[in-house]
A protein has these predicted regions:
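Short, C-terminally biased terminal segments at protein or domain edges
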Residues: 1-55, 59-130
Length: 130
């Protein structure tokens, strides 16, 4: 296998990437008039989660990495809000909504765990620095 970037080794990145593909599939069924509304918002935010995890992995300090993990979490919460609205507008049925929500919960838990690890590692580095 060819070289893997550090973000490609993160399970949370893989889950976020797969999640973004699922969001694309789900939003294809939205009304055409939502193409520049909810559809665009959801797909951009979904891509942002995986992309921000990748970008954060390239940061030199654990503090910066944790900041990007927090930004990715923020994008995930944006998606949560938009999915609730989509469901209430009748664009998603409850089964699809719950399936996507379950995936988000798993990503959310892993993102929080990653961020906590990064912050602990930063704290350890700061304590060792004279």
């Amino acid at each position: 296998m060819s070289h893997q970037f550090s973000f490609e080794k993160l399970e949370v990145w893989y889950l976020a990437k797969e999640f973004s593909k699922r969001i694309y599939a789900v939003t294809k069924k939205f009304p055409i008039e939502e193409r520049f509304g909810l559809t665009a918002q959801l797909t951009r935010a979904a891509i942002s989660v995986a992309s921000t995890i990748a970008e954060g992995s390239a940061r030199a300090s654990k503090k910066d990495q944790a900041h990007f993990s927090q930004l990715a979490y923020g994008s995930l919460m944006e998606i949560a809000c938009q999915l609730i609205i989509s469901c209430e507008l009748g664009y998603l049925n409850n089964t699809v909504y719950q399936e996507v929500r379950d995936k988000m919960e798993k990503i959310s838990n892993k993102l929080n765990a990653l961020r906590n690890y990064q912050l602990r590692a930063f704290s350890s580095q700061a304590k060792r620095t004279p």
